[in-house]
């Protein structure tokens, strides 16, 4: 009888639920031991989105919280640390808030959302109203945390007040967990109330983390390491653990052995190489890790369809604004060359500023490099010194994000020059290969090229295919088909002009050796051999132009048969 496999935890960020309902769990419980062994009163973990931050925070809550279900940790690695479990498991009041849902058009609405989060967490401790250890004044203070119209001054003190009341009732200091601490700041910057939100978060944290004598320790998570002067002013007990740090490097994301175990369990080991190429490559500290969101989603697809192709799961969870801003800098020659090196799988050396404010993020190209590194669009392969890193694109998925944004920016620049666009399209329709070639070469000079290393020939051809489609997409009166079945195979691009009397067939090839003339002839021969014109002839198109176009870096050769 075939074994029933555990469910894959897509989007499950509640540790207790994951364990109770028998989802597959990649064991990261030794984070608990390392956190206790490497003591810091306030710990901030910064990692890119979708790398397991929230699940780890939920796991910490499940372990430390008073009267927690110890069965959650049965057969986990931390359960073998018997003395540690006896001393710490289920022994502390835990306050756990997540700020990831604070997204509002105005500061006032964002503040209301923060109040609702505090209200919700305070309601978990309503037994304090019956406590014999709390005075009437204490209970009135607690009631103020339940009010939906809580004053902003109370909100700023709320986590400290709740900590003090819990310690007074239980006789035990409190563990404070704050997940996605930087999301309200990101939204506030985007929507124009950044200074007000910065002040609120600074006051909240100063009360909760600096002047809180009831605090055992705190753990915060986020994507960005916000400047200490911005919201962590005077917080001398803060330990920041970023993607560059060796400590805790294996606990966010899947290691290579984690992925091999998953694939073996689900009988998908034959997909290891493609998963590694698409989703591996991040280096946190000294450990190479995969994006867990990608691995879990792709494995789930493969369980249904073993022929499923890798997709950009991670990139679809964000607008990829940092990459968009970065690509807009490509008009500067140095930046363009650096992006071309990255796309080619090479490394570049940059000084990284890990502490920024959101106001600084896009203020300079130097800061943009730091944002791309911190948020997972670039990773490091080593250091030159404390702040200077060798940077590279981690994997195929991230490379695709760059290529997509490059293409979007290219289309934008094409649309801004209607005269050049009209010249190209008229020449294409008239069979003027010299002008088509000249126009294409001018376009190529203005965009980023695909260099030889790392990239397969098919992918290079796809890139240049995309460039041509990007140009042709603005010719609204033409019917443009891409990879349309015709004759004995598929033509790269098939066009019917507005009068439907002229048809254009384009075959694209990449000249690996740089011999553009020979490769463009090969492209033309393929059109003839595979009878790509059959469909146009069937539709009554009599005037057919056949183009063989060869590309090599920033050059092309165009030949035509009329």
Segments the model singles out, each with a brief description of its role:
Residues 433-562:
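Structural signature of nuclease core domains in nucleic-acid processing machines
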């Amino acid at each position: 009888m075939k074994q029933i496999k555990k469910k894959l935890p897509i989007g499950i960020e509640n540790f207790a639920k994951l364990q109770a309902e028998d989802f597959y769990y990649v064991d990261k419980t030794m984070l608990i031991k390392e956190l206790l062994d490497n003591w810091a009163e306030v710990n901030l973990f910064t990692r890119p989105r979708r790398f397991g931050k929230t699940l780890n925070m939920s796991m910490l809550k499940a372990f430390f919280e008073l009267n927690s279900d110890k069965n959650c940790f049965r057969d986990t690695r931390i359960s073998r640390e018997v003395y540690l479990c006896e001393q710490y498991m289920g022994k502390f009041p835990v306050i756990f808030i997540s700020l990831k849902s604070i997204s509002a058009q105005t500061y006032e609405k964002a503040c209301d959302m923060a109040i609702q989060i505090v209200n919700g967490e305070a309601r978990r401790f309503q037994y304090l109203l019956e406590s014999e250890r709390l005075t009437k004044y204490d209970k009135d203070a607690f009631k103020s945390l339940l009010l939906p119209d809580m004053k902003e001054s109370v909100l700023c003190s709320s986590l400290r007040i709740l900590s003090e009341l819990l310690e007074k009732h239980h006789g035990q200091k409190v563990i404070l967990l704050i997940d996605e601490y930087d999301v309200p700041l990101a939204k506030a910057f985007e929507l124009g109330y950044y200074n007000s939100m910065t002040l609120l978060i600074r006051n909240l944290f100063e009360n909760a983390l600096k002047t809180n004598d009831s605090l055992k320790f705190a753990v915060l998570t986020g994507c960005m390491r916000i400047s200490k002067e911005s919201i962590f002013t005077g917080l001398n007990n803060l330990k920041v653990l970023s993607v560059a740090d060796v400590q805790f490097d294996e606990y966010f994301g899947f290691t290579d052995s984690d992925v091999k175990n998953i694939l073996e369990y689900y009988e998908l080991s034959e997909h290891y190489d493609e998963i590694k190429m698409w989703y591996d490559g991040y280096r946190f500290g000294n450990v190479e890790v995969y994006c867990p969101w990608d691995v879990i989603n792709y494995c789930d697809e493969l369980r249904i369809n073993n022929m499923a192709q890798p997709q950009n799961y991670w990139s679809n969870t964000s607008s990829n604004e940092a990459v968009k801003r970065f690509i807009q800098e490509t008009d500067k020659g140095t930046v363009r060359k650096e992006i071309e090196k990255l796309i080619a799988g090479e490394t570049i050396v940059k000084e990284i500023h890990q502490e920024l404010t959101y106001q600084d993020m896009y203020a300079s190209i130097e800061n943009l490099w730091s944002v791309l590194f911190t948020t997972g669009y670039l990773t490091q392969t080593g250091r030159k010194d404390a702040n200077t890193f060798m940077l590279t694109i981690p994997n195929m998925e991230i490379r695709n994000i760059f290529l997509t944004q490059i293409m979007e920016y290219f289309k934008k620049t094409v649309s801004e020059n209607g005269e050049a666009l009209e010249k190209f399209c008229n020449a294409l329709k008239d069979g003027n290969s010299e002008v088509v070639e000249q126009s294409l070469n001018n376009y190529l000079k203005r965009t980023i090229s695909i260099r030889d290393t790392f990239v397969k020939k098919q992918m290079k051809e796809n890139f240049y295919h995309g460039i041509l489609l990007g140009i042709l997409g603005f010719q609204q009166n033409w019917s443009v088909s891409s990879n349309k079945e015709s004759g004995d195979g598929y033509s790269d691009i098939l066009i019917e002009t507005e009068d439907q009397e002229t048809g254009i067939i384009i075959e694209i090839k990449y000249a690996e050796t740089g011999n553009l003339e020979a490769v463009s002839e090969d492209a033309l021969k393929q059109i003839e051999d595979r009878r790509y014109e059959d469909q146009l002839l069937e539709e009554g198109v009599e005037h057919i132009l056949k183009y063989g176009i060869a590309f090599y870096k920033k050059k092309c050769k165009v030949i035509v048969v009329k």
